[in-house]
Amino acid sequence: MQTWQLPEHIADVLPTNARQLESAREQLLALFRVHGYELVQPPLMEYAHSLLTHIDAGLSLKTILVTDRLSGRQLGIRADITPQVARIDAHLLSANQGINRLCYAGPVLHAQPDGLPNMREPLQAGAEMYGFADIRGDIELIDLMLKSMKIADMGKVLLSLGHIGIFRALSDAAHLDAGQSATLLALMQDKDTGSVEAQVKAWKLDGMWAKAFSLLPRLYGGREVLSDARGRLPDLSAVGGALDELQAVCDAFPDNEIHIDLSELRVDNYHTGLLYAAYAADFHDAVARGGRYDGLGGYFGRARPATGFSFDLRSFIGRLPAVERQPAVLVDAEDAEAAREAVEALREQGQCVVIDYGIGHNVSEELAGRLKKTDGVWQIVKR
């Protein structure tokens, strides 16, 4: 194996793309900040039992585990930042009984590639709200997600909505056990209506519940899906409440194209209610995903309402606006010492100054000029 080779699905980010990513990251964090979201930076590695919450068993398949040479305990390299932020809210910020608005932007590592473009080291950025159960919190996060997509230059974005609470309400009312719910959930993900119907028939479910489960995969489309669902799904308070929340989101974004799918349940196991995602042209999958995950912090000692979204900023490289390198001022190597004061003054002003050793350089072809001493004063002489 060549010494320069990297592990599969791991890649370097070279200067041109690195400038794009860092510029977008700075803009995103500035956007989050003016909306009241405070930056947190959880560690890349934690004890495995902290990262692998019992709520999301699937996370263990993504997490790389190592042994800590100091303690002998098992460590995990984070595959998702949300459980870490839930820990921070539950433990380190527990003095605040009100709302915590938190955001982040950092790398995660996956044991296996998670779909296309098959990268194992996403740059996960996101925002989360803890301590507010009202649908207005979800609407605030969706608005922030859509604004984030503008920074990423996504163009027209489709807002997709779902609600796992509807499926769970039907499962509870039909008295399905955990295994049955998991089986039916998997069939829902595949939009396999025939298999759903065959499965509920095999379980000999009451006709009302069998009909409801068979109907869910067919309830998708525009805003009109909600009125259709109200007329066809069982009259359960939890189902009605979920539809009310979906309607509130639709009303909050009258100018956005919205797609509703009541069987779209492709979520991490910790999600509990409203689900939302953003789709853009030329991307095979959602460019951002979010939803409600009430109670996730309970694993760390404080269960609270929570909602948030995240996305892989690195997957946007092909779409991010170009960021040109700043034109540089060159100073001849033999003048560098004498011009030190002038050079540092320019750098403090934000000007890139590069020492020219006479063997070429990788600075921008559009040079700002060369630093020369003229009439006893160091000045930038244009080419």
From Swiss-Prot:
Pfam families, sorted: tRNA-synt_His
Annotated localization: Cytoplasm
Presence of the UniProt keyword Amino-acid biosynthesis in the record: yes
Keyword Glycoprotein: no
One Gene Ontology term, aspect cellular component: cytoplasm
InterPro entries, alphabetized: aa-tRNA-synth_II/BPL/LPL, HisRS-like_core, HisRS/HisZ, HisZ
GO BP annotations listed: histidyl-tRNA aminoacylation; L-histidine biosynthetic process
UniProt entry keywords in alphabetical sequence: Amino-acid biosynthesis, Cytoplasm, Histidine biosynthesis
Main location: cytoplasm
Pathway: Amino-acid biosynthesis; L-histidine biosynthesis; L-histidine from 5-phospho-alpha-D-ribose 1-diphosphate: step 1/9
Molecular-function annotations in GO: histidine-tRNA ligase activity
Superkingdom of the organism of origin: Bacteria
Role played: Required for the first step of histidine biosynthesis. May allow the feedback regulation of ATP phosphoribosyltransferase activity by histidine.
Family: Belongs to the class-II aminoacyl-tRNA synthetase family. HisZ subfamily.
Note: This function is generally fulfilled by the C-terminal part of HisG, which is missing in some bacteria such as this one.
HAMAP family: HisZ
Subunit structure: Heteromultimer composed of HisG and HisZ subunits.
Name of the protein: ATP phosphoribosyltransferase regulatory subunit
